[in-house]
Curated annotation (Swiss-Prot):
<protein>
    <recommendedName>
        <fullName>Protopolybia-mastoparan-II</fullName>
    </recommendedName>
</protein>
<keyword id="KW-0472">Membrane</keyword>
<keyword id="KW-0467">Mast cell degranulation</keyword>
<keyword id="KW-1052">Target cell membrane</keyword>
<dbReference type="GO" id="GO:0044218">
    <property type="term" value="C:other organism cell membrane"/>
</dbReference>
<keyword id="KW-0800">Toxin</keyword>
<comment type="function">
    <text>Mast cell degranulating peptide. Activates G proteins (G(i) component), which in turn activates the cascade of molecular events cAMP-regulated, resulting in mast cell degranulation.</text>
</comment>
<dbReference type="GO" id="GO:0090729">
    <property type="term" value="F:toxin activity"/>
</dbReference>
<feature type="modified residue" description="Leucine amide">
    <location>
        <position position="14"/>
    </location>
</feature>
<keyword id="KW-0027">Amidation</keyword>
<comment type="similarity">
    <text>Belongs to the MCD family. Mastoparan subfamily.</text>
</comment>
<dbReference type="GO" id="GO:0016020">
    <property type="term" value="C:membrane"/>
</dbReference>
<dbReference type="GO" id="GO:0005576">
    <property type="term" value="C:extracellular region"/>
</dbReference>
<keyword id="KW-1053">Target membrane</keyword>
<keyword id="KW-0964">Secreted</keyword>
<keyword id="KW-1213">G-protein coupled receptor impairing toxin</keyword>
């Protein structure tokens, strides 16, 4: 699992 991708997606989801 790419945590960076998840974190980036979460930031954009904000």
């Amino acid at each position: 699992i790419n945590w960076k991708a998840i974190i980036e997606a979460a930031k954009q989801a904000l």
